[in-house]
């Protein structure tokens, strides 16, 4: 086998967990030899393939494949748990894949096989800024009590990235959404939710009592929302995520 063929055979083995079929091996070899695609793009073809997706790997197993394929080693526990944490907080597998493919290690692997590494272009809004993505996922979890759906996540990330929404406006979009309203929260539960979203903690007894009283005395939920959303605590949360 030529070095390019060996590179492809390695992808079949590591990513698809099987031997290369003749026609597949020929087709991918052609693509690389002709310079039509880089090592990164061919790897993307394998990682994004229907066959790989059908393996339905857990995040942990997915990362093991990336470590073996692109870093040529077993995962170290510190590195792996950092990536697991990223995935758990809404960073997409595509974004993590890009991190592995654009590593020094994979650059080395490609040059070993005489291949140009190249880069990966991520086009979805949720893949443009990991911190913005994490902020939006946090809103889904704390306000709506669920994980983000892909189109919603892309929509909110886009609104924040393009400056169409500030962090406060995005949070308002969740708190005053039909989905949130359908939860029919009592004043107490409403205030508890605001503490989690804007203070990053559970409500303390005195604070909870004071805010519930404000509502009982006829103030609107919007008024209370503003009190939380304009707080120093929420500003600090936004700073942490690098958003305004």
Feature map (PLM): residue ranges:
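Substrate/cofactor-recognition hotspot
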Residues: 1-244
């Amino acid at each position: 086998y030529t070095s390019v063929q060996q590179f492809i055979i390695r992808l079949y083995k590591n990513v698809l967990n099987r031997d290369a079929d003749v026609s597949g091996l020929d087709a991918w070899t052609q693509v690389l030899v002709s310079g039509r695609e880089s090592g990164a793009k061919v790897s993307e073809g394998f990682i994004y393939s229907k066959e790989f997706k059908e393996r339905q790997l857990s995040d942990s197993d997915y990362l093991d494949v990336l470590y073996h394929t692109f870093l040529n080693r077993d995962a170290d526990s510190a590195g792996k748990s950092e990536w697991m944490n990223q995935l758990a907080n809404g960073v997409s597998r595509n974004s993590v894949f890009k991190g592995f493919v654009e590593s020094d290690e994979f650059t080395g692997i490609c040059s070993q096989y005489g291949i140009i590494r190249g880069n990966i272009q991520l086009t979805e809004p949720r893949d443009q800024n990991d911190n913005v993505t994490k902020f939006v996922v946090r809103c889904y979890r704390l306000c709506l009590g669920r994980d983000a759906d892909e189109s919603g996540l892309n929509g909110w990330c886009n609104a924040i990235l393009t400056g169409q929404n500030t962090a406060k406006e995005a949070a308002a979009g969740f708190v005053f959404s039909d989905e949130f309203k359908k939860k029919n929260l009592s004043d107490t539960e409403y205030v508890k939710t605001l503490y989690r979203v804007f203070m990053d903690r559970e409500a303390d007894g005195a604070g909870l009592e004071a805010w519930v009283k404000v509502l009982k005395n006829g103030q609107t939920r919007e008024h209370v929302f503003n009190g939380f959303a304009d707080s120093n605590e929420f500003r600090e949360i936004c700073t942490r995520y690098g958003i305004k």
